[in-house]
Amino acid sequence: DQSILNTIGSKLCKAILDQGHTLTVRPHYETVKRTPGVLQGLQANFSDHPKFNLILSMSENESLFRSQLLITDWSGISIEYSLGLGKPVIFIDLPPRVRNPKWQELGIEPFESWIRNKVGKIILPDDIDGISEKINEVISQTDQIMTEIKSIREQWVYNLGQTRNVGPKEIIKLLK
């Protein structure tokens, strides 16, 4: 698995914590299932740090609401987090997971790629030691990024604020 935690997780956590930032690690449930040793290593290395928190429960949401930003790779959580919560994202530029090796033949930029520079900033894995500067940059630009997120949300999220009224009607249509 080429995810953040499996490739640069420990280095990233150390860089964030060493700069005095609070860090909540919320691994994907597949990471919990497939590579528990990585998480045990993070727990062993950082559990005594007062600003480190590891959350393994997928039902816990409070940390998302309290957070200022998300750090991820190509995970879909970036779209949910940015468009759903209206908060910025820092993307670690790891190689994307490709499920369709012929995707480029379509001549369409994937939404996951298109949205990255609009809802946050991208940092190379080799630049992780400078993650604190990127965090501070994103936090200082939160208002600008939120304006862009709002525009994207209006363009791409249908029935925004009306799902409760529209959703059940559409489900009933499908059931007929």
PLM segments and residue spans:
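C-terminal alpha-helical cap of glycosyltransferases
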Residues: 160-176
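Structural motif
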Residues: 22, 68-69
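Short acidic alpha-helix that forms the nucleotide-activated donor recognition element
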Residues: 58-67
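Catalytic binding pocket for nucleotide-activated donors in carbohydrate/polymer assembly enzymes
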Residues: 41-49, 74-155
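Active-site donor-binding acidic/aromatic loop of nucleotide-activated sugar
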Residues: 50-57
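Conserved catalytic-core segment of nucleotide-activated headgroup transferases in glycan assembly
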Residues: 1-43, 125, 159
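A structural signal for isolated positions on well-ordered beta-strands in alpha/beta enzyme cores
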Residues: 22-24, 53, 90
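Short beta-strand/turn micro-motifs composed of small residues
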Residues: 25-27, 72, 93
